[in-house]
């Protein structure tokens, strides 16, 4: 991972300039549903294959019978203190939505909000350079953008991608019998909250950063497995929230093996110190009625907001071995965390 090219004064800590952190500052699903409930007449475009109706990771527009264009945007406030790393994480997170649809990114433009009377422009320059670094790693140009004077630092991207329509994966197309796999461990919200609470040990500072800077490029290859029936990335709504979207969209119930859910190193240690982000509580308040009765420990893990989290994959039993081989080849632990079944209960997720 590249270091920031310019040394900043130790006194500049970006997380002290924001009230939220990363995807943990997302508006809750319940409130977002109210915001998106338009009062205008319905307008449709037959070439818009994926839009607001399905709560998916990105929009997809059909260009012709073979190719679709993917469009997405994502931005947030600082989740780490280092400007370059913040920009890199924000960009990595935004690009992830393209991979979550099974596509390939082709271009990005930047979104920057900056408190120009509080933080030097040179700090913003490093944030943008961090975004450029992530774009270069994804093989795309940061081709432009827009900036405003804002009370808190905000950075992200609008990303354009393309996809062969035969490879398109959505988050609401899972099937009964599918197995569930996760490509990154959970716990980013816990560890970044430990940093914000000044409880994070120096030797642990790399754990969440390394995870957040890892591009989900494997999504493009996963999508080529015909038995992968649904795909999404796990971000601000937590594992439970994004799993619920998958279940509700396909009218299925998930049997989740809680003890199999992979966790980042030291996540449980910092959870024991009370490092629970506010987004965890907002997530549970928003969708807890669709979950089984959970302990506080289970809530803290399943509802932990992830920033630049991994991919949640629903794969048929017949194609499971092919997915396992692919994950192994990319040095990702192929751990099955559950399965999807025809509903037998009013809740969408049960623990087993």
From Swiss-Prot:
Its cofactor is Mg(2+). Keywords: ATP-binding, Kinase, Magnesium, Metal-binding, Nucleotide-binding, Selenium, Transferase. One of its GO terms (biological process) is selenocysteine biosynthetic process. Binds 1 Mg(2+) ion per monomer. Mg(2+) binds at residues 57, 97, 233. ATP binds at residues 26, 54-56, 74, 97, 145-147. It catalyses: hydrogenselenide + ATP + H2O = selenophosphate + AMP + phosphate + 2 H(+). GO terms for molecular function: ATP binding; magnesium ion binding; selenide, water dikinase activity. The active site is at 23. GO terms for cellular component: cytoplasm. Transmembrane segments: none annotated. SUPFAM superfamilies: PurM C-terminal domain-like (SSF56042), PurM N-terminal domain-like (SSF55326). Homodimer. Belongs to the selenophosphate synthase 1 family. Class I subfamily. Synthesizes selenophosphate from selenide and ATP. This is Selenide, water dikinase. It comes from Shewanella baltica (strain OS155 / ATCC BAA-1091). The gene is selD.
């Amino acid at each position: 991972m590249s270091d920031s090219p310019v040394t900043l004064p130790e006194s500049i800590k970006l997380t002290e300039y924001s009230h939220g952190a990363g995807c943990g500052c997302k508006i809750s699903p319940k409130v977002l549903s109210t915001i998106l409930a338009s009062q205008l007449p319905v307008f449709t475009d037959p070439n818009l294959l994926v839009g607001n109706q399905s709560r998916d990771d990105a929009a997809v527009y059909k260009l012709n019978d073979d190719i679709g264009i993917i469009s997405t945007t994502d931005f947030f406030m600082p989740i780490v203190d280092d400007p370059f790393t913040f920009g890199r994480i924000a960009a990595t997170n935004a690009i992830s939505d393209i991979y979550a649809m099974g596509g390939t990114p082709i271009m990005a433009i930047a979104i920057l909000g900056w408190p120009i009377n509080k933080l030097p422009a040179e700090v913003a320059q490093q944030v943008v350079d961090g975004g450029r670094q992530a774009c270069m790693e994804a093989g795309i140009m940061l081709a432009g953008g827009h900036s405003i004077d804002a009370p808190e630092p905000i950075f992200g991207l609008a990303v354009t991608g393309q996809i062969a329509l035969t490879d398109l994966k959505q988050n609401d197309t899972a099937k009964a019998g599918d197995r569930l796999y996760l490509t990154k461990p959970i716990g980013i919200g816990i560890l970044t909250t430990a940093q914000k609470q000044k409880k994070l040990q120096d030797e642990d500072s790399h754990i969440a950063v390394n995870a957040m800077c890892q591009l989900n490029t494997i999504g493009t290859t996963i999508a080529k497995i015909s038995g992968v029936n649904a795909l999404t990335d796990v971000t601000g709504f937590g594992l439970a929230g994004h799993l619920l979207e998958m279940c509700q969209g396909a009218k299925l119930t998930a049997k989740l093996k809680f003890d199999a859910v992979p966790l980042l190193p030291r996540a449980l240690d910092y959870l024991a110190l009370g490092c629970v982000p506010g987004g965890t509580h907002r997530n549970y308040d928003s969708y807890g009625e669709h979950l089984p009765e959970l302990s506080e420990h289970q809530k803290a893990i399943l509802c932990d907001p992830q920033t630049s989290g991994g991919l949640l994959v629903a794969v048929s039993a017949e194609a499971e071995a092919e997915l396992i081989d692919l994950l192994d080849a990319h040095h990702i632990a192929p751990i099955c965390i559950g399965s999807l079944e025809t509903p037998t209960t009013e809740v969408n997720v049960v623990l087993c």
